[in-house]
Amino acid sequence: MGEETGGDYHVVLEAAWIVYNVDDEDDAINIAIAEAGKRLNRHGLDYVDIDVGFYECPECGNEIEGVWIVAGTALVRLILSMRVFNAESEEHAIRIAKYEIGQALEDVPLGVVEVTPL
């Protein structure tokens, strides 16, 4: 029997990032990306790509930025993507990505957006 090697995957996660004391969407997005980047870099995860997520408006079909501000507090949908190598399956790749990113971002909720084989 030959030794099996795992597969390589591109895993895209979404994070629900809260930003306090902001007045507009651009500030909320910039602060969220900067704070997430600092935490990821502190854990040596500078290879994780960070972007703001978009949603499709149910009324008009246009894309809108994933940021909502209420009472000076913003919820920003961040998109975090990374490559996972030698994973046993897509599910294993997701667990690896969530573990690595989750350790750096601590209490930030993460969800799976997409997993594609490389």
From Swiss-Prot:
Q: Name one Pfam family in it.
A: DUF555
Species per Swiss-Prot/TrEMBL record = Methanopyrus kandleri (strain AV19 / DSM 6324 / JCM 9639 / NBRC 100938)
Q: Which family does it belong to?
A: Belongs to the UPF0212 family.
- Enumerate the NCBIfam families for this protein: PRK03922.1
- Name this polypeptide is given: UPF0212 protein MK0748
According to the lineage, what is the superkingdom? Archaea
